[in-house]
Curated annotation (Swiss-Prot):
Pathway: Cell wall biogenesis; peptidoglycan biosynthesis
Organism from which the protein derives: Lactobacillus acidophilus (strain ATCC 700396 / NCK56 / N2 / NCFM)
Keyword Nucleotide-binding attached: yes
A GO biological process held by the record: regulation of cell shape
Designated name of the protein: UDP-N-acetylmuramate--L-alanine ligase
Keywords: ATP-binding, Cell cycle, Cell division, Cell shape, Cell wall biogenesis/degradation, Cytoplasm, Ligase, Nucleotide-binding, Peptidoglycan synthesis
InterPro entries: Mur-like_cat_sf (IPR036565), Mur_ligase_C (IPR004101), Mur_ligase_C_dom_sf (IPR036615), Mur_ligase_cen (IPR013221), Mur_ligase_N (IPR000713), MurCDEF_pg_biosynth (IPR050061), UDP-N-AcMur_Ala_ligase_MurC (IPR005758)
Keyword Cell division in annotation: yes
Pfam families: Mur_ligase, Mur_ligase_C, Mur_ligase_M
Free-text function comment from the UniProt entry: Cell wall formation.
Enzyme class, broadest EC rank: ligase
């Protein structure tokens, strides 16, 4: 249990979820510190900014349960020196999901789950609710904020290894169920069953995308509201206008017109995310004008269609690494930059996912003006595989394999929007390219 009289020690503090949680607890007045690998990660910047101490893994960091509450990252096993020290000393730990569940039970809680769109929707909902009431949040891009006496707690609920089954929220948004994590889930049915279990643990209402048949198949004893573009949806986005500055639309709530909303975001998926946010806020009786203002002032989530301009070249950084996400990002890029050449630099993420979706990746990348593919990003749990980036390139006419040593090839693309997409360390490719501009 969390205790302000003890140090909260994070084993693996630089993981995106762990970093978010550390920031949230620090904001709430807890004594937070932790350890991780020495290799630089972007999540350590906000931790260091607020003075959270980050050490290298060392068994001497582990004291006792009288002095510390140990929060262990999901990726760390008995071969980690601090996990081993806990076992040797009889020191108990709690998991990241179990710690988040403690916070879930303190507030009106809204979890955001789904294969795609979790981070964007969590960021947007936290921003909108934060305009009207104290709101704490945990976002999967390494951001977390704790506010004393929060009315709302908004958090990203990750389905990997069924971690989100530790949570029992008041509300839950489910954006979609699109098979992923083939290294853990056996098949689509196994994957869908995890979401059914998560739905079973939601207390007040479930908000689901109306076009997703698997979401429609979920059985619940609580209200299940749909959102989308169809007349049959409980919350329907209508009269949609798309421009190069964003999108605007009206929302009908059970047939009642809630008025006009505007977002400086792009693509159908952004309108769907906004409609889900409106649905939750409306259900919690948040004033419509406050929702409108929150949507209008939202500037986007980290690594979700993040833009930079370099003369006639626009650079977009996006986390997309699944075919559905890639299609959405490409659609958004075409909306924002209809007159530019569309160039994609794609980093395949894990060998198992690349093998599973090889044909989808090839089909998507054949439809852009120019595709570059970096070497496959291997995860800690899957160091190698029987597929390479070259296997994709040979099926995508005009595409090339790109690495840091030939990143200058990208400068040949004039009057272009260059989209760097991937969930691994693709920012290093973007950084190297930008130094050439």
């Amino acid at each position: 249990m969390l205790d302000k009289n003890k140090q909260i020690w994070f084993i693996g503090i630089k993981g995106t979820g762990m970093a978010s949680l550390a920031l949230l607890l620090h904001d709430l007045g807890y004594n937070v510190a932790g350890s991780d690998i020495e290799k630089y990660t972007f999540t350590e910047v906000p931790l260091e900014k607020v003075g959270i101490d980050i050490k290298s893994f060392n068994p001497d960091n582990i004291k006792s349960n009288e002095e510390q509450v140990i929060v262990k990252g999901n990726a760390f096993k008995e071969d980690n020196p601090e996990v081993k020290a806990c076992l040797d000393k009889g020191v108990k730990w709690q998991s990241y999901p179990d710690t988040v569940e403690e916070i879930v039970q303190m507030h009106t809680s809204i979890g955001i789950s789904g294969t795609h769109g979790k981070t964007s929707t969590t960021s947007l909902l936290a921003h909108v609710l934060g305009e009207v009431a104290p709101t704490s949040y945990l976002i999967g891009d390494g951001r977390g904020k704790g506010v004393d006496d929060s009315r709302f707690f908004v958090y990203e609920a990750d389905e990997y290894r069924r971690h989100f089954l530790a949570y029992h929220p008041d509300y839950q948004i489910m954006t979609n169920i699109d098979f992923d994590h083939p290294d853990y889930f056996k098949d689509q049915d196994d994957y869908t069953s995890a979401f059914q279990s998560a739905a079973d643990q939601t207390k007040k209402a479930l908000f689901v995308w109306g076009d997703d048949k698997r979401l429609q198949s979920l059985k619940t004893d609580i209200p299940k509201y749909t959102y989308g573009f169809k007349d049959t949806d409980d919350f329907q986005a209508v009269d949609i206008k798309k421009t190069t500055t964003g999108s605007s639309f009206n929302v009908l709530a059970h047939g009642k017109d809630l008025g006009r909303f505007e977002i400086h975001l792009f693509g159908d998926h952004s309108i769907l995310n906004a409609t889900a946010v409106i649905a939750v806020a409306y259900t919690e009786k948040v004033p419509m004008d406050a929702i409108r203002e929150g949507l209008l002032t939202f500037k986007g989530a980290k690594r979700r269609f993040s833009e930079k301009d370099f003369g006639d070249i626009a650079v977009i950084d996006d986390y997309a690494h699944h075919p559905t996400e890639m299609r959405a990002t490409i659609q958004a890029a075409r909306q924002k930059f209809p007159d530019k050449k569309l160039v994609v630099v794609f980093q395949p993420h894990t060998f198992s996912r690349t093998k599973k979706y090889q044909k989808d990746f090839e089909e998507i990348l054949r439809d852009v003006d120019k595709a570059y593919i970096t070497p496959i990003y291997a995860s800690a749990r899957e160091a190698n595989g029987d597929i390479t980036s070259e296997d994709l390139v040979k099926n995508i006419p005009g595409s090339e394999v790109i690495d840091l040593d030939n990143i200058a090839d990208l400068t040949k693309n004039k009057n272009s929007v260059i989209v760097f997409m991937g969930a691994g360390d693709i920012p290093k490719y973007e950084d190297a390219f930008e130094k050439l501009l």
